[in-house]
Amino acid sequence: MVLRRSRRIAILSSLLGLFLLYHFVSFRPELYSRTYDAAAAAAAADPSECPDLPGMEDVLVVMKTGVTESLDKVPIHFKTTLRCVPNYIIFSDFEEEIEGVKIHDALRTMDSVVKDTVADFDLYNRLREQGRAGLDNSDFADEANSNIGKPNNPGWKLDKWKFLPMVQQALLHKDNAKWYVFMEADTYISWPTLLQWLAHFDPREPHYIGTETQIADVIFAHGGSGFVVSNPAMQLATNEYATRTIELNEYTDWHWAGDCVLGKVLADAGVPLHYSWPILQNSNVGELDEFAKGFYRKPWCFPAVGFHHLSKREIQDLHAFEKRRRQETDNPVLLHRDVFKELIYPELSNVRDSWDNLSDQEHPTINTFHECQILCAGSRHCAQFVIRDGICFTGETPRLGVSNPAVRSGWVLSNIDRMIDKAPRCSRPDFGV
């Protein structure tokens, strides 16, 4: 790729950027004005459906998706995570409507030179010319995630370019929001818990909050886990992008992770990341280790605000779970303790067929389920076991796991009960601040 570097082009690009900024601010229509009505209608139809969310009016929820997943993954959020949210906007690589809600093109304000010359934009340009008819089967082909993402997936290659323009457009969409909460289409956020957590931060200060991840020397918030940016930090990031557009486009082209690019921009602007783990998770419920020992924090008494890598069914189940909790308790804060006791523990049993509980301590000389069960039951430090490919694995902390027809799992409930009894009482949530 060759990006134009001459002084003349730089000046023209800057003038074009200022024109677009003026035009967008001065003449933009309401990008999505029905969210207030949707939230009010949901509350009127069923008061239990929408919890009291004081402060949510000062939050803009920003969802990022892509054309190859949006029709499948976005609609469930209209019935769950977004149902009672007064202000939200959804960005993709293709502008369209889904169930009457406008999906915005995150890349529409980007430099056309980049979009016309960078190979990553092949999918985007086909969409602009042909709409969804321009998609082919290879665009939907899944690819296993590697340590550098999915470099052969057209949608994934395009995704990194969305972050900086998305931040810019989100700020323009609601420039008076105190907080901007970014999520993806396979993310779930507990809004009551989020608001209780954010109450410990001053929105007048620049904040960048998320699950800490590192590539080279850049520490950034993992995008899929969800992350939060205050209004002053959004302004700083937008100013950086506006004044360093060519440089940052070159950096994005060289890089492979857009959330890392955003983290670098914020760091350059003097806004370091506030670490949020385990409050925001890059895991679904089945993968959670609520008794984790090997990290700098133990999840048990921390709020559980966000989950990632969720199916539509899992998002629906979490929404129903929170609705049920509202009817049973006045406490708006969901702790990891509650997730374990109320969601995970009831699913554990002595034996569970067609299930992998993700035990990872290998015992290669033990090859039968019965022997593996005896081994685990004989240790006070063993919480679970599994036979996987004819080999016994055990685990010292209980996890729910995932469906797998070729695997058989089990848990030692007496040991797990002992762990629960010894766990902290959580007299107050640990908000990590």
Residue ranges of each PLM-predicted region?
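Conserved catalytic core of nucleotide-sugar-dependent glycosyltransferases
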Residues: 187-268, 272, 280, 330-339, ...
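Active-site-proximal specificity loops/subdomain of glycosyltransferases
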Residues: 93-177
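Short aromatic/hydrophobic "clamp" motif used to bind/position activated sugar donors
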Residues: 180
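A conserved hydrophobic helix/loop-capping motif in glycosyltransferases and polysaccharide synthases
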Residues: 60-68
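Short, acidic, metal-binding catalytic loop of nucleotide-sugar glycosyltransferases
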Residues: 56, 76-88, 95, 100
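C-terminal catalytic/acceptor-binding lobe
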Residues: 2-39, 254, 260, 265-433
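Short, well-formed alpha-helical segments that are part of the catalytic scaffolds
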Residues: 46, 69-81
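Acidic donor-binding/catalytic loop of UDP-sugar-dependent glycosyltransferases
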Residues: 68-71, 176-177, 185-197
